[in-house]
């Protein structure tokens, strides 16, 4: 796997360099980078101990013919024949509640691998775009780092107050049309956009019935955290930079944002506003 990892890393570095060099450019050709080695690396990065999806296939079963399975998957992607299966919905307790639950969508193992492969293509672009305040669902960033940054911001503030905002049921209500528009600002590769569209429309199986929501992205999907970060990068972070900052008497910084659900906080002083979020340990995590 070492050679595969090196090859993938080199390609990702090239994507990242181009994204940094051309921050307004939309990438039109990325899917060709996805070869068998890329899928092998995606498989290596995919959790193998999770529950099976609607097809019941486990990692052990898939790995018995891994090379053949990945080549078949790649062929279906390249030809456009890949069909995203429904996710299997289960409900887990929400936070520490004994009454509320959170719906989780469990993709098939093969879907997880392909979603991971697409995330590996998109992350080098969006990691150049995302703001320093965003900590949730990002590689190399943690709840503890968000908490420390939040504490530092509070200590540097001279008075003021903290405003907490809860974006309820964000995953369930994510607007597909707006998400597609945001994606196309940086990605216009037809293969990738069609794959993402298939995942958004794949449907949800629960109690033997399949439904097809016209909004949302299943919690539990490998690509869902990245899609949510892209959406909020434009809707929340972009709004703050574009519309809020210019109306403030003093300049301010969007300091810290932690996504575990979708709750964020704004630290406000007399003339300066910055929004932030800490970690679940401080009970200021975003609750989906």
Segments the model singles out, each with a brief description of its role:
Residues 1-288:
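Non-catalytic terminal/accessory segments
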């Amino acid at each position: 796997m070492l050679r595969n990892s090196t090859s993938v890393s080199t390609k990702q570095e090239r994507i990242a360099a181009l994204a940094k060099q051309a921050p307004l450019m939309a990438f039109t050709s990325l899917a060709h980078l996805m070869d068998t080695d890329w899928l092998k690396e995606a498989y290596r990065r995919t959790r193998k101990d999770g529950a099976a999806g609607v097809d019941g296939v486990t990692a052990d079963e898939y790995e018995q013919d891994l090379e053949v399975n990945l080549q078949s998957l790649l062929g279906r992607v390249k030809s456009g024949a890949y069909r995203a299966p429904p996710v299997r919905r289960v409900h887990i307790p929400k936070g520490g509640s004994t009454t509320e639950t959170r719906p989780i969508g469990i993709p098939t193992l093969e879907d997880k691998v392909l979603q991971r492969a697409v995330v590996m293509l998109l992350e080098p672009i969006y990691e150049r775009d995302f703001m320093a305040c965003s900590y949730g669902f990002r590689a190399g960033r943690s709840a503890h780092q968000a908490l420390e940054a939040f504490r530092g911001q509070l200590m540097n503030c001279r008075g003021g107050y903290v405003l907490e905002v809860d974006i309820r049921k964000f995953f369930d209500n994510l607007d597909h049309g707006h998400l597609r528009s945001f994606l196309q600002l940086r990605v216009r590769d037809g293969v990738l956009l069609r794959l993402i569209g298939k995942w958004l429309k794949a449907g949800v199986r629960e109690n033997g019935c399949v439904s097809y929501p016209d909004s949302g992205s299943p919690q539990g999907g490998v690509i869902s955290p990245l899609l949510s970060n892209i959406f909020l990068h434009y809707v929340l972070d972009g709004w703050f930079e574009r519309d809020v900052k210019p109306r403030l008497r003093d300049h301010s910084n969007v300091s810290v944002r932690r996504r575990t659900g979708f709750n964020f906080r704004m630290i406000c002083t007399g003339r300066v506003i910055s929004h932030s979020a800490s970690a679940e340990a401080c009970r200021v995590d975003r609750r989906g």
